[in-house]
Amino acid sequence: PYVLDATAGLGSDAFVLASLGCPVTMVERVPEVHALLADGLRVAGAWGSAKDQTLIAILKRMTLVESDAAKYMQTLEDTKKPEVVYLDPMFPLRTKSAQVKKEMHVFQQLICKDVDADLLLQTAQECAQKRVVVKRPRIAPFLAGLEPNYTLEGRSNRYDVYLNH
């Protein structure tokens, strides 16, 4: 399915989806994060073109857009709306004393807090043709307090799936 990753970050989730064959549009609104991801894609493309055709095929399925995701989704024509919208909003700040991973600490400094994540879920539901998938910490409350149709749970994260009927 065609996936819109509305919270691209460093693109790791989008890369996994693209490696599974999904065309993915990644939307990132923070200019510094967008620049990091764009540079990473450029470097991967340059390296892959000389050595790895599989990597090139994956990268061809990935498109990067610098925009506010809600505004981007609202401007899509019906024929260009994705089957799936994927959201990975900044996880809530930890209550544990242990620090987050180094890359996430940098993200928290750049992004602070995703204060509009609840609204983004609503916009995503209006945009997605089939479903919205939200990645959350396993013990975090549901985004916007909205219970999903079903949940896929791992050791530390879960994926809340909201179906559009």
Describe these PLM feature segments.
Residues 27-84:
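S-adenosyl-L-methionine
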Residues 117-163:
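Conserved Class I SAM-dependent methyltransferase catalytic core
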Residues 10-22:
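Conserved SAM-binding loop of SAM-dependent methyltransferases across substrates and taxa
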Residues 20-22, 101-105, 150-151:
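Glycine-rich, phosphate-binding/catalytic loops in enzymes
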Residues 89-120:
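Mobile active-site "lid"/loop adjacent to the S-adenosyl-L-methionine
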Residues 8-10, 31, 71, 90-92, ...:
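Short, glycine/acidic-enriched loop or turn micro-motifs at the edges of active sites
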Residues 1-9:
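Conserved class I S-adenosyl-L-methionine
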